[in-house]
């Protein structure tokens, strides 16, 4: 134990020393956020026509807010282009207009026309609305000159256990964790934009029943807006946000006063009808074709303006985009993100632990097998919102039994899943607890088959730049897992962020019997120190460089006897971000791994390459280049060379994207890995090909084709979406999966065709 404590202490001393030498200017106080009064639309007055033309007389009755400040490239300087934002409330709707003046409208960049597409590569505006004025949570709305709908939810100011190194919102990046920003929430609202001879303009109409809020007169909300002037690579804010943070930092938002907020009745029904045909070419008995016609219903009831009940019957996710293939060269499970809408909405409410490392609740465990095969969900419900000063979430889902292909035998038991989550916000800090339960049900489930996980957590804002978080959790199991499933896990994590430094460190511990079956836990039985440091200075005398971004990260795993299991260093001393976007640099990775048992890194057509148990250490060096992402033709390249266990490793990763028009894009990627080991040589190739065409901002057709030599399969997913409101509409999906290498099975493995129609019925 002394070894890893000593090593971690050295990293922590470096962090404190670096923070101590932060220039005094960095610690300067933020200017107080601006305050403005919302305009009021009389019941007798005509509502603004949402057409992207800010020319109605009603807008002239509202005082515009036009003082915007740069975050980049010159922090604190006035915006180089004028922006006017007006906010109007009336008739149960929040109206927002923006005039984004531009001295040369011909240079406006428009690169996306699909709903929820990234806004970081296009001229755009993103708004955060803190409807509870709690300085932690917000709804996010954004758009670009084509009028796309971009929306999401922010919790805990977008902060989590990762280290944010991007800014601006609407597609900012985060390395090392998952942000508490959920871009998969789809609200019911309207937006229109257009480019004019003075720049571009946009109008938004957001019904109050789309939001959650506290009723009453003369209420105050937090409000901030970021404008991305992409051809200048300039980001400006209504309320000043220092570097290192983004639009999700709602505690720094402006205050929007004078809101009269009525009680609301919010009942939504979302019925669906579906027809599908699936053909399994590998089936040797019975009919290879399964035809299905079914219907289901989602129900949403706003019990109170700040509390919502969702219910689902005969749930279906046929329209969900396919997973992107990954290559696994480790001895641990890969992480695939959730993509199903029902579980994505309000997902941050149920987040607990350290994402992708110690997750107590991972919704992909519900309704999906370990290999990603769907398991029927009979129904369920979710309650989420605020109740008596608490953020609350309750979820219950019942899955069906899984049968064999012929439908003659139950091969998988039914399960009932329950999750309860509570959080109390105190200032910008929060404290909470979670309970997760899986209970086997149905004819084949043992009576004592269950798994439970429960824990408490805290996120403490020590200062404007320092945050401390942590949790303690335990699991218990019955049945065959009873001996394994009772043990503890915990973590403490510290994060310091300002406009030059992002420094963080933490310690995790997971017992050998800790077993959250409804969570995600790639390994157990360890103690883990970790440390990260990012330094992002902006040179003033080198005109073409936006910033340098050297960074360092370290983590290691020890067993409870103090023996090293594995260790990883990422040393990135050289990274340059040019002013026009993109980045390039060189880095080195150092790894140690001491597997106690052999494991396979290649297994194809009976040929296996196995790493023996032992002690290994190796270095790899890499050069990477990412072109300006807003360019019409963009891409990236990374070349890596070095060792891998006791062999040699060479890889090249290439991506290229061509924006044919703002409505049509195509991209191709290629990852090539050449690995030579004493136990055998092998090559991995992963090739994703993507194409998208948007007929309108709500109608598009997309294709994802992938080849993965590790599995030998080529898969195709083609998806036509014609949306009307809040992510509902007509979906047509075609899937095809082929085995290109095996000589023992049919080339075509499976094929499916799905037509699904959903409709939002609002009361």
Pin down the residues of each PLM region.
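Bacterial N-terminal signal peptides
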Residues: 11-24
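Large, well-folded core regions of big proteins
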Residues: 375-381, 387-388, 394-396, 426, ...
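Surface-exposed extracellular loop regions of Gram-negative outer-membrane beta-barrel proteins
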Residues: 263-310, 417-477, 539-542, 547-551, ...
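N-terminal secretory signal peptides that target proteins for export/translocation
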Residues: 1-11
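Outer-membrane beta-barrel proteins
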Residues: 207-215, 247-262, 303-307, 346-350, ...
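Structural preference for beta-rich elements and adjacent junctions enriched in aromatics
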Residues: 27-424, 432
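Exposed, low-structure sequence patches enriched in small/polar residues
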Residues: 376, 471-763
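Outer-membrane beta-barrel transmembrane domain signature of Gram-negative proteins
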Residues: 240-262, 402-454, 459-462, 584-642, ...
């Amino acid at each position: 134990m002394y070894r890893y404590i000593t090593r971690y202490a050295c990293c922590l001393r470096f962090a404190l020393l670096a923070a101590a030498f932060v220039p005094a200017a960095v610690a300067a106080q933020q200017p107080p956020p601006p305050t403005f009064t919302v305009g009021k639309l009389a019941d007798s007055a005509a509502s603004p026509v949402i057409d992207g033309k800010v020319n109605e007389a009603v807008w002239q009755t509202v005082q515009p807010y036009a003082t915007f400040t740069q975050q980049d490239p010159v922090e604190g300087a006035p915006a180089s282009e004028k922006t006017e934002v007006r906010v109007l409330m009336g008739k149960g709707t929040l109206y927002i207009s923006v005039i984004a003046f531009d001295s040369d409208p011909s240079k406006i960049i428009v690169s996306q026309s699909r709903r929820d597409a990234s806004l970081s590569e296009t001229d755009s505006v993103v708004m955060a609305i803190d409807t509870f004025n709690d300085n932690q949570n917000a709804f996010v709305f954004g758009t670009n000159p084509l009028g796309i709908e971009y929306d999401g939810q922010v919790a805990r100011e977008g902060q989590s256990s990762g280290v944010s190194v991007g800014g601006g919102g609407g597609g900012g990046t985060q390395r090392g964790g998952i942000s508490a920003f959920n871009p998969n929430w789809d609200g019911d609202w309207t937006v229109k934009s257009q480019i004019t001879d003075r720049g571009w303009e946009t109008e938004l109409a957001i019904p109050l029943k789309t939001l959650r809020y506290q009723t009453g007169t003369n209420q105050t909300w937090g409000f901030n807006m970021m404008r991305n002037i992409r051809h200048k690579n300039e980001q400006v804010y209504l309320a000043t946000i220092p570097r290192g943070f983004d639009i999700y930092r709602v505690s720094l938002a402006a205050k929007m006063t004078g809101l009269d907020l009525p009680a609301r009745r919010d009942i939504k029904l979302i019925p669906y009808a579906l027809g599908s045909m699936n053909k399994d070419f590998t089936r040797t008995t019975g009919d290879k074709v399964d035809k299905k016609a079914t219907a289901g219903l989602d129900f949403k009831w706003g019990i109170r303006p700040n509390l919502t009940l969702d219910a689902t019957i005969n749930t279906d996710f046929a329209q969900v985009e396919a997973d992107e293939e990954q290559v696994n060269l480790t001895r641990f499970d890969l992480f695939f993100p959730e993509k199903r809408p029902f579980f994505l909405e309000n997902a941050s409410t149920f987040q607990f632990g350290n994402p992708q490392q110690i997750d107590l609740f991972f919704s992909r465990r519900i309704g999906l097998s370990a290999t990603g095969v769907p398991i029927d969900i009979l129904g369920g419900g979710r309650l989420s919102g605020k109740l008596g000063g608490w953020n609350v979430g309750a979820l219950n889902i019942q899955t069906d039994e899984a049968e064999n292909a012929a439908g003659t035998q139950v091969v998988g038991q039914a399960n009932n899943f329950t999750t309860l989550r509570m959080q109390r916000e105190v200032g910008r800090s929060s404290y909470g607890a979670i309970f997760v339960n899986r209970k086997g049900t149905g004819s084949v489930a043992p009576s004592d088959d269950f798994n439970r996980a429960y824990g408490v957590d805290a996120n403490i804002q020590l200062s404007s730049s320092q945050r401390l978080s942590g949790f303690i959790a335990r699991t218990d199991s019955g049945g065959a897992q009873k001996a394994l499933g009772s043990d503890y896990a915990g973590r403490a994590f510290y994060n310091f962020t300002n406009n030059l430094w992002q420094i963080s460190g933490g310690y995790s511990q997971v017992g050998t019997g800790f077993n959250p079956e409804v969570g995600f836990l790639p390994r157990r039985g360890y103690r883990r120190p970790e440390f990260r440091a990012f330094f992002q200075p902006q040179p003033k005398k080198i005109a073409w460089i936006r910033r340098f971004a050297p960074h360092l990260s370290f983590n290691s795993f020890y067993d409870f006897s103090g023996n090293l299991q594995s260790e990883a260093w990422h040393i990135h001393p050289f990274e340059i971000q040019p002013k026009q976007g993109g980045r390039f640099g060189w880095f080195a990775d150092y790894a140690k791994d001491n597997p106690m048992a052999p494991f396979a890194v290649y297994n194809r057509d009976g040929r296996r390459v196995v790493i023996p148990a032992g002690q290994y250490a190796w270095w790899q060096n890499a050069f990477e280049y990412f072109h300006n992402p807003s360019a019409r033709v963009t891409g990236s390249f990374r070349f890596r060379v070095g060792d891998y266990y006791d062999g040699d490793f060479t890889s090249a990763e290439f991506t290229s994207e061509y924006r044919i028009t703002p409505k049509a894009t195509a991209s191709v990627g290629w990852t090539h890995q050449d690995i030579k080991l004493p136990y055998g040589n092998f090559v991995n190739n992963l090739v994703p090909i993507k194409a998208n065409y948007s007929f309108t901002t709500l109608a598009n057709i997309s294709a994802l084709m992938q080849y993965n030599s590790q599995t030998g399969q080529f898969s195709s997913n083609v998806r036509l979406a014609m949306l009307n409101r809040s992510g509902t509409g007509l979906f047509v999906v075609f899937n095809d999966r082929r085995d290109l290498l095996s000589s023992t099975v049919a080339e075509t493995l499976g094929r499916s065709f799905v037509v699904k129609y959903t409709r939002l019925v609002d009361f």
